[in-house]
């Protein structure tokens, strides 16, 4: 999320930038005094973020200074008496906002990884002000006219393909954000955007509070029967951190909850932990998000109508690969039926195990992971507890580096402690170099969960690659929520955690391999349903023999993972895919239908329940993200009507992985070169469909996706997705 400051008394209106700028310059006249956030980044590698010197009181003044600087730059562009050209308009617009970009980088890290009450107060103050600031730029009619003139004028024919793409992108983005609306509509749109910014912040903060402040406490070690020793120690440490030494705590985060649900023998405690987790944001307390969701949906529907779209979903997907909600839904429905059929088989297998044990139960949602693990042990002689000692975080991280070097010639060299500032002692930094030793960028890694850090895993782009005014190195980070081990012990991952590790590293490589001139087109700044292609594709290298045999070594003996265990892992590759697919699609289809519903008031709980009933959601599975804590779609606009993107990208991923198979294996240099050239390095300089065709030689097919997940052939013909 972005957070910026505009004096709340200012009314945003078309052509009102000068008034806003004047007010902001007054409020921020002392913003740069001894403030590390407003100074150019110092240090090696073209400068690095000043994480070590920032305090919460620096944030608001720095944001004000950044906005004032960008608004002044925009006003100069808009008021330029010279005819609009690429250099004096498009390139100048690219250069505007560099100070604000630097401030927002650090601010985003603070609010996402080190949040506390003081920062949350700043977030609440800043959210609507940033929205107003953004609208002030969008609604500058002279700026839009100049950008459109370059995009549509005679000069466009003489621009490079990347320059034409950039001019098109800025003109399109401004138009989609309301630049063509009349004065009254612009005023209403600005008010909507400011309220939405506040609501998005409220939603995310409520989820963070629920995750940080709630846990299930266990008073007897017998309550952890079946739970691996590493998870027990983590639970004991979590209890100590919460003032309950001698007890055990299961925090309300996925990294703690899922291992408990997988291994804990006590069914009543599994249910208790499960309910804590799935009811985040839905408890009727101060952090309940249902009312927030209702209002967000209403405002999004109204905004879409103002912008000339039938629904929010139609607006969001216009610039995606899918293009329309109908195409996205067609893909989801093509996968839904075989996935549900597979779930029926999985549940039957689990019920048979429970019956054989004399459990006297009917499989419920809090039983799924537990009995699925039993089925996997019985069918494939494979279980998480056997795998975990081989999945050491540090060694698998080295395995990722091995993949990056072998495929793309990138080498990762650790920097010493204190060589560049970091925001927490857990964070480490690596210099990334090409085959010739030249620095490509920096990779920051923040692996462990902690209080004040939002849940999940993500890649952050501290600074995009560019060469508009000289070569600028990208600075990227991967952020995870793995359970931190006790001092002196290795961090051991589940297979899912290891997959997440490789997934996020795929995003990092997308940023590090970027090779474009303009920052707005760099790295991961691509369509939402395309950006997951590099990340999901890199997951495949985790299970290659070359990675497992070298880097999956036992934490005590140091011996590599046995070949027969690797064979069992590969045989179990499609295991439990019904569950994984249905829990995802439940969330993705509810997301899409919420945003196709139009302007009618929505009760989130009722809508979710009725939608899942209509779909035929198996009762043994709950959505991966229930509506009241669905940060992807309600903490900002990011994945709203776009959670399907992971499936769309996985269709591309399965098809792209096939290119390596057709060429003889995962290390084929020619295929890797095409992947880097046409996908990773190209950023948004070309249309993603064209970029994929250049890499693959054709359009993708859904059949590879269904084969990957172990499902039947496509239910719908490929033409339904065209």
Task: Kindly give the residue locations of the regions a language model identified.
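Intrinsically disordered or highly flexible coil/loop and linker segments, enriched in small
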Residues: 68, 72, 76-83, 99-116, ...
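Bacterial N-terminal signal peptides
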Residues: 15-27
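N-terminal secretory signal peptides that target proteins for export/translocation
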Residues: 1-12
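N-terminal helix-rich structural modules
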Residues: 4, 32-233, 722
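Short His/Asp/Glu-rich catalytic/ion-coordination signatures at enzyme active sites or charged loops
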Residues: 43-58, 107-126, 149-191, 251-291, ...
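Active-site-proximal, well-structured secondary-structure segments within enzyme catalytic domains
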Residues: 162, 166-168, 198, 205, ...
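C-terminal, non-catalytic "cap/extension" segments appended to globular domains
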Residues: 32-53, 58, 65, 247-249, ...
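Short pre-active-site segment immediately N-terminal to the catalytic Zn-binding motif
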Residues: 483-501
């Amino acid at each position: 999320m972005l957070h910026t400051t505009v004096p709340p008394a200012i009314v945003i209106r078309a052509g009102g930038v000068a008034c806003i700028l004047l007010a902001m310059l007054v409020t921020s006249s002392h913003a740069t005094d001894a403030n590390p956030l407003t100074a150019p980044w110092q240090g090696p590698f073209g400068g690095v973020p000043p994480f070590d010197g920032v305090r919460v009181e620096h944030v608001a003044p720095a944001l004000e200074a950044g906005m004032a600087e960008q608004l002044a730059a925009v006003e100069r562009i808009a008021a330029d008496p010279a005819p609009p050209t690429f250099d004096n308009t498009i390139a100048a617009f690219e250069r505007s906002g560099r100070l604000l970009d630097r401030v927002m980088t650090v601010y985003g890290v603070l609010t996402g990884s080190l949040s506390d009450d003081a920062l949350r107060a700043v977030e609440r103050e800043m959210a609507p002000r940033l929205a107003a600031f953004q609208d002030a730029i969008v609604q500058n009619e002279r700026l839009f006219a100049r950008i459109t003139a370059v995009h549509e004028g005679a000069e466009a024919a003489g621009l490079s393909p990347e320059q034409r793409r950039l001019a098109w992108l800025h003109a399109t983005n401004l138009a989609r954000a309301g630049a063509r609306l009349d004065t009254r509509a612009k005023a209403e749109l600005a008010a909507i955007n400011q309220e939405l910014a506040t609501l998005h912040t409220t939603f995310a903060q409520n989820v963070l509070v629920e995750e940080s402040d709630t846990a299930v406490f266990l008073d007897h070690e017998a309550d952890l029967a079946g739970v691996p020793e590493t998870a027990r120690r983590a639970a004991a440490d979590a209890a100590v951190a919460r003032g309950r030494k001698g007890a055990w705590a299961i925090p309300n985060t996925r990294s703690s909850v899922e291992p408990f649900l997988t291994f804990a023998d006590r069914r009543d405690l599994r249910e208790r932990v499960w309910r804590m987790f799935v009811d985040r944001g839905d408890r009727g307390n101060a952090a309940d998000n249902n009312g927030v969701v209702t209002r967000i949906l209403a405002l999004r529907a109204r905004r879409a109508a103002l912008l000339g779209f039938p629904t929010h979903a139609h607006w969001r997907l216009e610039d995606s690969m899918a293009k329309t909600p109908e195409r996205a839904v067609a893909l989801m429905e093509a996968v839904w039926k075989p996935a549900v059929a597979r779930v029926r088989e999985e549940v039957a297998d689990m019920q048979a195990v429970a019956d054989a044990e004399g459990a006297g139960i009917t499989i419920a949602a809090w039983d799924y992971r537990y009995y699925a693990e039993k089925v996997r042990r019985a069918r494939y002689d494979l279980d998480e507890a056997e795998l975990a000692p081989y999945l050491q975080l540090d060694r698998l991280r080295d395995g990722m580096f091995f993949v990056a070097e072998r495929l793309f010639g990138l080498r990762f060299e650790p920097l010493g402690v204190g060589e560049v500032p970091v925001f927490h002692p857990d964070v480490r930094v690596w210099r990334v170099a090409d085959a010739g030793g030249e620095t490509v960028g920096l990779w920051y890694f923040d692996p462990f969960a902690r209080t004040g850090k939002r849940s999940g895993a993500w890649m952050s782009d501290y600074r995009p690659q560019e060469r508009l005014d000289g070569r600028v190195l990208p600075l990227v980070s991967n952020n995870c929520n793995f359970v931190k081990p006790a001092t002196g012990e290795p961090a051991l991952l589940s297979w899912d955690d290891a997959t997440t590790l490789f997934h996020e590293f795929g995003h990092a490589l997308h940023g590090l391999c970027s090779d474009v001139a303009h920052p707005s087109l760099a790295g991961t700044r691509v369509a939402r349903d395309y950006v997951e292609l590099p990340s999901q594709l890199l997951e495949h290298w985790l299970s290659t023999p070359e990675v497992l045999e070298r880097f999956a070594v036992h934490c005590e003996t140091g011996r590599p993972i046995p070949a027969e265990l690797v064979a069992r892992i590969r045989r179990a590759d499609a295991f439990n895919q019904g569950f994984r697919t249905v829990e995802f699609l439940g969330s993705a289809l509810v997301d899409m239908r919420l945003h196709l519903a139009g302007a009618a008031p929505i009760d989130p709980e009722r809508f979710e329940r009725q939608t899942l009933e209509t779909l035929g959601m198996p009762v043994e599975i709950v959505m991966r993200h229930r509506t009241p804590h669905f940060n992807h779609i309600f903490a900002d606009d990011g994945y709203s009507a776009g959670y399907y993107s992971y499936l769309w990208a996985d269709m591309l991923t399965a098809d792209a992985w096939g290119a390596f198979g057709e060429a003889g294996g995962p290390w084929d240099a020619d295929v890797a070169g095409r992947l880097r050239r046409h996908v990773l390095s190209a950023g948004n300089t070309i249309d993603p469909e064209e970029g994929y065709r250049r890499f693959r030689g054709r359009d993708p097919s859904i059949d590879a996706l269904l084969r990957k997940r172990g499902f039947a052939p496509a239910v719908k013909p490929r033409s339904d997705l065209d």
